[in-house]
C-alpha cells in the first residue's frame, strides 16, 4: 500500500556552494530522495537541518553520505524541533527542481512532505 503524504514545505537548498553538490551533481535529478539530519554542532544556525544525499558504492558496498547544504534558516525551526524529538522518519525530502544555470542558491529546490504514520 502506498503511504499517504502531506505537502509540508518547498524551499531552496541553502549553502550549496560550500558543500559536496559538485561531487554528485550528475547523480542528482528531479525526484532524487534526500535525507534531513539535525546538525547540532552548526555554529551559524542553532536550528540547522542538513540535507544529505546517500549512495552505495557499487564496488565496495559502502554507504556514502554527501552533505549537499541546508534547509534555509528562516524555514528550519519546526523541522529541527521534530528531528530532535525523534521524528526523522516522518519526512520525505526530494529534489523538485534543478537549474544548473541559476545562481547557487536557486539551483536546487526541495519539496518536503510528511509521511502518514500507518499503524498496523
Predicted regions and their residues:
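Conserved active-site motif detector
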Residues: 1-120
Amino acid at each position: 500500500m502506498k503511504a499517504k503524504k502531506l505537502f509540508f514545505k518547498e524551499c531552496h537548498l541553502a549553502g550549496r556552494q560550500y558543500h559536496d553538490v559538485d561531487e554528485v551533481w550528475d547523480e542528482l535529478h528531479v525526484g532524487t530522495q534526500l535525507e534531513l539530519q539535525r546538525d547540532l554542532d552548526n555554529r551559524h544556525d542553532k536550528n540547522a537541518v542538513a540535507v544529505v544525499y546517500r549512495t552505495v558504492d557499487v564496488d565496495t558496498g559502502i554507504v556514502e553520505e554527501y552533505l549537499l547544504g541546508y534547509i534555509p534558516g528562516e524555514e528550519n525551526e519546526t523541522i529541527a524541533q521534530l528531528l530532535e524529538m525523534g521524528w526523522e522518519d516522518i519526512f520525505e525530502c526530494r529534489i523538485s527542481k534543478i537549474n544548473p544555470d541559476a545562481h547557487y542558491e536557486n539551483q536546487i529546490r526541495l519539496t518536503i512532505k510528511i509521511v502518514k504514520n500507518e499503524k498496523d
